[in-house]
UniProtKB/Swiss-Prot annotation:
Superkingdom in the source lineage: Bacteria
Family designation: Belongs to the MnmG family. TrmFO subfamily.
PANTHER family, alphabetized: GLUCOSE INHIBITED DIVISION PROTEIN A (PTHR11806), METHYLENETETRAHYDROFOLATE--TRNA-(URACIL-5-)-METHYLTRANSFERASE TRMFO (PTHR11806:SF2)
The protein's name: Methylenetetrahydrofolate--tRNA-(uracil-5-)-methyltransferase TrmFO
Gene name in the database record: trmFO
Length: 444
C-alpha cells in the first residue's frame, strides 16, 4: 500500500485533489474543519460549497480561456466538472450549477471512495513530515495562517471577496422584468431565456447610484487591509470609481430588448441569474456588496421589478488570504522551505472556482505521482492549467503578485491576424494548441 496523502480543506481544490490522488491508487486523508469549525461565508459542512456565485463562467472551449480550462478538467476526468454537468442550470453560454445538490454530490462521491477517509478537524499548524496538500482557500484559519507566516517569514496578503444577494423568483415583478440572455445566446429556449432583466431609465439609474454611494457600509476590522480582487469588486466600490462604471459593467444594457416595451432602449439593466434547478432563486449578477443589510434591502428595492422582492440571502464580504506563490512555491507547487507540503487552490493566488479546482487537480496528481515514485511535470505553459501554474510559481512578478483568473494573456503568444475577426481566430488558435498539448501531457 502506498503512503497516505493528507489534504487540508475540502473546497474546490481539496476535493478535486483528493479525487485525483485516490483515482491514481494513493490513500487520501481529507481534513475538513467544517461543520465543527465554521466560517463567515459557509452555510454547511458539505464539500465544494459555492459561497459566492453559482457560475463556473463561460463554457466556450474554443474561444474562451475559462471554457478551455473546463475542457482540460473534463479530459482529466475531474470530479468537479463531472458533478457540475450533473447539476447544470440554464445560463446562456455559461456553466451555472444548482449549488446545494452539486456540493452534496461531491461530498457523497468523496466519502464513498474506498481510498478516501475524512477527518473532521482543524489543522492548526503546518506538519513537518508526511505528504500534504494545503487547500484551505480564502478563509484559511487564523492558526494555520499564523503557522505559515512563522515558517516563511512572509506576510500573507489579504483582500476581500464580496457575496451577491439572492432573490426569491416569485417576488420579482415580471410585468416589468423579462427573460432573455444577452444577445439571445444559447442553443435551447431555456438557455436563451436564462436571465431575468430589470431595466432602468437614466433618472432611475442616477437615483440608484446616489443611494449606493450614500448607503452604510460594513467597516473592516482593525488590522485588516481593505483590498479587493478586481473581478469581485463590490458594486458600491465600482460606483465610487465613476458614475458610469456600473452601466459599462454588470449593468450594461447591450444585447437586450425589453419584451414589454421593445421600442424603449434601457439606460442600464440589472440581470438576475438562476441560482437553483427549481428556478425559485435568482442571484443578482455582479451585485456583490459590503453594504449593511438594512441598506441593501432599501437600495435593491429601487431596482424596477424588485420593489417587492424578498431576499433569500443578502450580500456580504469575506476575507481572502493567499501566498506570495512566485516566491514560496516551486514548479511542482511544493513549499520550497518544506517540500513535503504542496499548496493548491485560492490560497496559491488563483481566483475563481474553476481555477481553484484545476490547481487542486494538478496538486493531487503531482503529489500522488511523487508518492508512487514517478515524476510528473506540470502541463506545458501552452495549456490553460500550465499557464496558470506557471504564472503562480514564477511567471508573475513577485512584488506585485495579486490573485489571477485564467486568461489568454498568461499563455505564450501566438501569431494570428489582428482586428476583431482576427482576435476570434487567435483565441481558436490558442485553444487548438492547448488541447493538443494537454492531450499529449495526459498520455505521457
Amino acid at each position: 500500500m502506498a503512503e497516505s496523502l493528507h489534504i487540508v480543506g475540502a473546497g474546490m481544490a481539496g476535493s478535486e485533489a483528493a479525487w485525483q490522488a485516490a483515482e491514481m491508487g494513493v490513500p487520501v486523508v481529507l481534513h475538513e474543519m467544517r461543520p465543527k469549525v465554521g466560517t463567515f461565508a459557509h452555510r454547511t459542512g458539505q464539500f465544494a460549497e459555492m459561497v459566492c456565485s453559482n457560475s463556473f463562467r463561460s463554457d466556450d472551449d474554443e474561444r474562451n480561456a475559462v471554457g478551455l480550462l473546463h475542457w482540460e478538467m473534463r479530459a482529466a476526468r475531474g470530479l468537479i466538472m463531472e458533478m457540475a454537468a450533473a447539476h447544470r442550470l440554464p445560463a446562456g453560454g455559461a456553466l451555472a450549477v444548482d449549488r446545494d445538490p452539486f456540493a452534496e454530490s461531491v461530498t457523497a462521491r468523496l466519502r464513498a471512495h474506498p481510498l478516501i477517509s475524512v477527518v473532521e478537524e482543524e489543522v492548526a499548524e503546518l506538519p513537518s513530515s508526511g505528504n500534504w496538500i494545503v487547500a484551505t482557500g480564502p478563509l484559511t484559519s487564523s492558526a494555520l495562517a499564523e503557522s505559515l507566516r512563522a515558517l516563511t517569514g512572509a506576510e500573507a496578503l489579504a483582500f476581500f471577496d464580496a457575496i451577491a444577494p439572492i432573490v426569491y423568483a416569485e417576488t420579482i415583478d415580471m410585468e416589468v422584468a423579462w427573460r432573455q440572455s444577452r444577445y439571445d445566446k444559447g442553443e435551447t429556449e431555456d438557455e436563451r431565456t436564462a436571465y431575468i432583466n430589470c431595466p432602468m431609465n437614466r433618472e432611475q439609474y442616477e437615483a440608484f447610484i446616489d443611494a449606493l454611494l450614500a448607503a452604510e457600509k460594513t467597516e473592516f476590522h482593525e488590522g485588516e487591509t481593505a483590498g479587493y480582487f478586481d473581478g469581485c469588486l463590490p458594486i458600491e466600490v465600482m460606483a465610487e470609481r465613476g458614475r458610469e462604471t456600473l452601466r459599462h459593467g454588470p449593468m450594461k444594457p447591450v444585447g437586450l430588448t425589453n419584451a414589454h416595451r421593445p421600442e424603449e432602449k434601457a439606460y442600464a439593466v440589472v440581470q438576475l441569474r438562476r441560482d437553483n434547478k427549481l428556478g425559485t432563486l435568482y442571484n443578482i449578477v455582479g451585485f456583490q456588496t459590503k453594504m449593511k443589510y438594512g441598506a441593501q434591502t432599501a437600495v435593491f428595492k429601487m431596482i424596477p421589478g424588485l420593489e417587492n422582492a424578498s431576499f433569500a440571502r443578502l450580500g456580504g464580504i469575506h476575507r481572502n488570504t493567499f501566498l506570495n506563490s512566485p516566491t514560496l512555491l516551486d514548479d511542482r507547487m511544493r513549499l520550497k522551505l518544506r517540500p513535503n507540503i504542496r499548496f493548491a487552490g485560492q490560497v496559491t493566488g488563483v481566483e475563481g472556482y474553476v481555477e481553484s479546482a484545476a490547481m487542486g487537480l494538478l496538486a493531487g496528481r503531482m503529489a500522488a505521482a511523487e508518492i508512487l515514485g514517478r515524476d510528473l511535470p506540470p502541463p506545458p505553459p501552452e495549456t490553460a492549467m500550465g499557464a496558470l501554474v506557471t504564472h503562480i510559481t514564477g511567471g508573475a512578478e513577485a512584488k506585485s503578485f495579486q490573485p489571477m483568473n485564467v486568461n489568454f494573456g498568461l499563455f505564450p503568444p501566438i501569431d494570428a491576424r489582428g482586428g476583431r475577426r482576427g482576435r476570434k481566430d487567435r483565441y481558436k488558435a490558442y485553444t487548438d494548441r492547448a488541447k493538443a498539448a494537454f492531450t499529449e501531457w495526459l498520455g505521457a
